[in-house]
Amino acid sequence: MHRFLELLACPICTGDLTADWSCRSCGARYDAPQGIPNLRLPGDAQTERVRGFYEQTPFPDYPPGASLSWLRARAERSEFARAFDHAVSGDARILEIGCGTGQMSLYLARAHRLVIGADLTRAALILGSAAARRFGLDQVRFIETDLLRPGLRDGTFDVVYSSGVLHHTPNPRAAFARLVRLVRPGGMIVLGVYNAFARIPLRLRRLVARLSAYRCIPFDPVLRDRENEPARRTAWLRDQYRHPEEHRHTLAEVQTWFAENGVHYVRAYPSALLGDEPDQDALFESAADSWRFEGLLAQMGWIASLGHEGGLFVTVGRRT
């Protein structure tokens, strides 16, 4: 427990927390229902709206009978997940911000790394915590907290990973600036957000869906694959087609965030270099110097390669 406590902090004053969830500095007291610390302070109206959205349908879900081998097989269908797992050292302290039901947190924790999965949706965290117990993973903990006032200690994590989160915040640029403070100098930031180009196919499908009162959603491969899984189909529909807050970003925009916050740009995934072959061993190694025009052309190519699902891309950086 001590190893996890030293990574947490009072969200009010950043003071140390005791084992009974009180702050040594300001005296604030917190609780941990079902073993999940609640270090979330009340948010603004839009943040609370997004939290309520996910409380109704935690995302992504676990199928009946899910096991650790199922989790690994599911994760490793993704080239990115394999590359990420390979790049992170075995003794790393990892934070996943916006972990949802914790599937990536659990996948990374199975290699005996110290992992904290943080989210503002308790219903999702309960599923993740239950899965951790079922899979026998004791190197991972889940906490309920908000990115803008997190119950987490600044500058302590070797890797901060956040995917599918910032584009659902009211101000993604400000949210990124807060996220950067959590990683130690020299540590890695792995950020996944919707791409402005790659999101175009889904936005077109969403337009048709709205105009047809959701009776017609053409050419969505995820819905087609989940035709016989109504719960998972509903979760995808809500997350992709009816989310109350969504932003989309270009690679150049994210690179600007990096520069503003003292983060050295390492690479994009998929690669923003035309003709560059993905290398499983190189996720944390700097790519060749990129040309913004080349990056623009690469992103136009992502319309086809990423647009069949959600259009999410990953940018990797190192805090200086």
Features from the language model and the residues they span:
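Conserved SAM-binding motif I beta-strand of class I
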Residues: 114-119
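Rossmann-like AdoMet/SAM-dependent catalytic core
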Residues: 230-318
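A short acidic, Gly/Pro-enriched loop at the edge of an enzyme's catalytic core
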Residues: 148-159
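Conserved class I S-adenosyl-L-methionine
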Residues: 188-222
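N-terminal auxiliary segments of SAM/dcSAM-dependent transferases
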Residues: 1-61
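Conserved SAM-binding loop of SAM-dependent methyltransferases across substrates and taxa
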Residues: 101-112
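Conserved alpha-helix/loop element of class I SAM-dependent methyltransferases that forms part
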Residues: 66-91
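A short glycine-rich, Lys/Arg-flanked "PGG" loop and its adjoining helix->strand segment in the class I
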Residues: 173-185
